[in-house]
Amino acid sequence: MKGDGIPDYQTCTRYVYVPGHFKKVIYRLHRFTQDGKVFEPKTPPAVFMNSSYTSSFVAGLLQLRYMYAMPAERIIHYFEDQGFNLKKPTAGFLLGRAAETLENFYKAIRKAVLSDDYIASDETYFKILVPEKNSKGKGVKKGYFWVIVGRESGLLYAVCRDGSRAGDVIYDELHDYHGTMHSDAASFYRKIQCDDFPNITRIACLQHIKRKFIDCMDTEPEAKEMVKLINKLYHENHKHKIGENSWTVEDNFKWRQQYAPAILAEIKDKLNEILKKPDLLPDSELSDAASYFNNEWEAVVDIFKRGDTALDNNLVERMNRYFSMSRRSSLFFGSHKGAERAAVLYTLALSAKMNHLNLFDYLADILDRTAKWQPNTPLEKYRNLLPDRWQPSTED
């Protein structure tokens, strides 16, 4: 520092990229003999039996595959560029064993999600290689993941059953469920409103409804008015956020009781006006939007009977983008078994994402912690290691 108070140095910043690197650690394990008996040394722990790969390697592989949507072949080339030769069968082995090892975490997440009082569901498609040829002569079939999110726990559960989109898949998951479920108006979801599911209240997605009016509002003034009315609900809903400034679920419910009835009545009047228009063409976009909204009306009103419900199902749709990223990158799964394995790993990856965890850190930690747990370990023991409760290990 100079006498005039001016520093005699200045600082500047340069950012350096250091590519990922791999370590090959060789242990020298000593045998010893006592009283004529040879004692073999214990080998360092490995995440999988008969494998030389550590939890960090497996966690890195899973992060690239299921968070960054890199297909296995691309990961192999990426590793090659960094000086490591990973064979494709080895990559497949590690991914498969990871799914098997994390199976109990998957089951524990399912149990936690379906214990949540408020869930949301959607489905998304993928392509799968099958022996049978389709009409175009290709052995490719469209399959589906069903996604259920626990809105209170922030955990995500993905299920794939032979790629089926039949309602039985979701019905089997929900047959004992008690609570509120958010979804769009696909027929298999609307069936949940019937007497077969007396303990479930299905609520609608206002964004799905609004999009239908947006699609025709350039040519239909009534559609533009309806969009403005729906936006009034969003405007009032955004004035407060649960957890901020001591705002509680009960506060939010009371606030909804104040603003929602008048706006909903205004919307219902406009909806009836559209439906009764003498010149409304049955096959028009406006007619389709109004009919869709009218069929969902009860499920819309039910949104405002709780203080903690969202106005739409956008959270699940955002999570589904990770499936679509993989779909665009990988093109297909090699088999139904591969898709079911992916459901396990996506469940862990996206649950970690929803809880703002670094997937690499999370997976490396839980793989190490549970390496010696038996397959029949009670699911309750996994509960505090799920992403919504996990705390990093304090062990060295």
Which residue stretches match the model-derived regions?
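Basic, low-complexity segments
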Residues: 1-51
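Catalytic center-proximal scaffold of phosphoryl-transfer enzymes
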Residues: 29-33, 38-396
